[in-house]
Amino acid sequence: MECNLAQAKQWVSALDQRRFERALQGSGDAFQHVLAIVPLLLHLNHPQLPGYVIHAPSGIASFLASDYQKKWLTNEYGIHYADHKPSTLKSAVNFHEVFPPILGVYVMGSFGSISQTSSSDLDTWICVRDGLSLDEYTLLTQKAKRISEWAMQFNVEINFYLMDQQRFRNEHYADPLTIENSGSAQYMLLLDEFYRSAVRLAGKPLLWLHLWVENEKDYEKEVARLITEGEIDPNDWVDFGGLGQFSANEYFGASLWHLYKGIDSPYKSVLKILLLEAYSKEYPNTCLIARTFKRDLLAGNTNPDHHFDPYIAILAKVTQYLTALSEFKRLDFVHRCFYVKATEDFARYQANNWRIRYMEILAQEWGWSAETVKHLNKRPFWKIKAVKENHDNIMKFLMLSYRNLVEFARKHHIHSSVVPQDINILSRKLYTAFEELPGKVSLLNTQISHNLSEAHLTFVEVRGNKHFKDGWYLINQPIHHIMFSKERVIEYGESLNKLVSWAYFNHLLTEKTELSIFSKNVTLSTLQRFVTNLRQSFPSTIAKQPKNSDLLNQCEIRSLFIAINLTTDPTSKVEEVLTGISSRDLFSFGSLEQSLVGSIDFTYRNVWNEIRTLHFEGQNAILLALKVLSNKIYRGVNRPDSIQVYCYSERYRQDLRQLVMGLVNRCVSIQVGDIQQPCQTSRLRVAGKNWQLFFEDRGISLQEIGNESVCNEAESAVDFDEVLQTPIEDGETNQESRRYPPEMDAFASEGFLQFFFEDNSDHSFNVYILDESNHLEIYRHCDGEKDEKVREINQLYQNAKQEGDKNPYNIVQHNFNYPQFYQLQNGKNGISIVPFKFRQMNK
């Protein structure tokens, strides 16, 4: 394809202007103001201006201030800007005239596309010159952060990313993974997204957009040739390089990243992860959208079907892929996601808005009825059944794409390019958001509907019905309107505690909700008191995302709510009236020696911001509850911020509450290290039997006195002997063989397989393995390379489901319980634990 750079500049500039105009259509004055002023604030570093940081580098290459920017400077701050006389500002502005630190500023993503809405953020790349010092980089980062804070005053969210031109050539990841930064999860796929959507706000043009090369792997050679022959001056351009290094190794990390983004942007993520799936289908000859855009633009095709809109192009690519597979159900859901995303501001749009007009055309092409369009337009006001159906479909189709990409990686023996620390964080974020576990309260995506509150909620208990399994059912109608049927049920829970928690944390249950109950065991007044106590113990809104630092540690309990005798109350059937009894007699009461604690329910929020529930019932409920609690309060961790205990029994309410609260507080205090457990262990008499409680490193063990059988089951740990090749030495005593660094306790996390590497002086290493239940396995003096062990274990995990019974290591693969790897380091202050890092990254 022949194309001169002068002509290419005109076409690229025209496309920038076209996207810029589209971005402003439907946007408010505040958005337009921020967009106009941001480049100026990056260019200047004046004490009076927003974003000022003393000594911060400033100055954008080839910057020319607009009339709007000059007027704003003069009117707001009395500063007079001279375009061609930067020296006039030198006394007030840190101005880099000869070598500006900022080569270019570009906004990317949904900007100017059909998916842009009033709530869309501005993902902005700041390309800095090579050789910027660490101090300069830090100061410029601080300046960008302050500009972001200034923009938030106008309700405009800007995410700045400092980039250098070698980032993608070297695959270095200077910035850690955050809620907006994909870290090491993407390289070429991120560059593909940038090139297909970038709009230059200031600075130098992007060379790649102007230069066509038939084979992308020849891009660097072609650029070098043009420089040698004097056809281009590299100082006139910003060049992040070509897409020739694109590798299928990225699919795994990118799929995790888009699943993670799907927590907050579900409709967009359905499209993006499906694009990855479509890309993988074309492997190894993947046709990237950025290449398609550039080919059409430089060929002079200024009005292609995709309109140079990245999201319209994604839709076309995904449609072609799913149609070829005859997966029309998935395609219909993709259409719905696309429509919902594009019409997010439907209520604010005017009838002549180009986005609305385009979506009306697509709806007709898809053969939608007027009822379908009307239903989707009312999406912000959907109630629970429509929201649940939509939420379940989003989860189903996200996970289907993810599994297809995992299968693709397995089939082609692809290794992930994501570094272990990022995979640890990503997998734990996804585990908390997507993994369905017993007792875990599933939170519906808050982006689907604005208001799920219900005027009436009825809780129905079912026992011994051949048509319904035992448990609790929730219906969003008053009790006198109920014709109980499966069609009317909106949610099921094995325990009342979990069902009430689900309704409360998903905002169906509010202070205005009228409650009803149909149960032989729980009265309406008890239910109402329980709901009131739950509301007093927890805010209904949970913080969106846990911090990365929290995710790198174990999931400590942050807030704990305990309900005694909520669903089973032995005191209501007590016929003996005893006086002068000890509080401990309540666990072995009267001549029948029955425990007056019939049920205990836990509701707790952990530092990963999960809501979990536990239900214990029967004569040994108190013992089971204490044992499980001790396993979840890890040695040496912080004490929970709050522990609330409530009792709902008919009799002995305060006595039972005080007794259980005392035991719980003692259990917690021993586990966190507030008090030292004496050698003589605690004893309890429960339901006519004496029990001894042993407080150990990993929780309480229970033993009936006079009976040598220990209640806690001994489960065997995962056998990784063949991977690590060195079992525990025969000469070690059992006590010596079980010694492990106690610092590991702070990292123990349920649900994950964790590996801790410890280097020895003879260049071998020890490996401590904690399985999903935190059972410990130790391998000492292992040989070989740790990098290879990590890759081998990851491969074993990846193949676990396919190999079935042939899996020699008993790895249990769930959706996001990826093996986690850590390194123990000896320092002056003792042992520290850090995420494991490869010595050499895979390219």
From Swiss-Prot:
It is found in: Cytoplasm. Its EC number is 4.6.1.1. It comes from the Bacteria. PROSITE patterns: ADENYLATE_CYCLASE_1_1, ADENYLATE_CYCLASE_1_2. Its main location: cytoplasm. Residues 549-843 are annotated as: Regulatory. One of its GO terms (molecular function) is ATP binding. It catalyses: ATP = 3',5'-cyclic AMP + diphosphate. One of its GO terms (biological process) is cAMP biosynthetic process. Residues 1-542 are annotated as: Catalytic. One of its GO terms (cellular component) is cytoplasm. Induction: Expressed during exponential growth; expression decreases 10-fold on shifting to starvation media. Disruption phenotype: Loss of competence, the ability to bind, take-up and integrate exogenous DNA. Loss of the ability to ferment ribose or xylose. Plays an essential role in competence development. NCBIfam families: PRK09450.1-2 (NF006978). Belongs to the adenylyl cyclase class-1 family. PANTHER family: ADENYLATE CYCLASE (PTHR38760:SF1). This is Adenylate cyclase. It comes from Haemophilus influenzae (strain ATCC 51907 / DSM 11121 / KW20 / Rd).
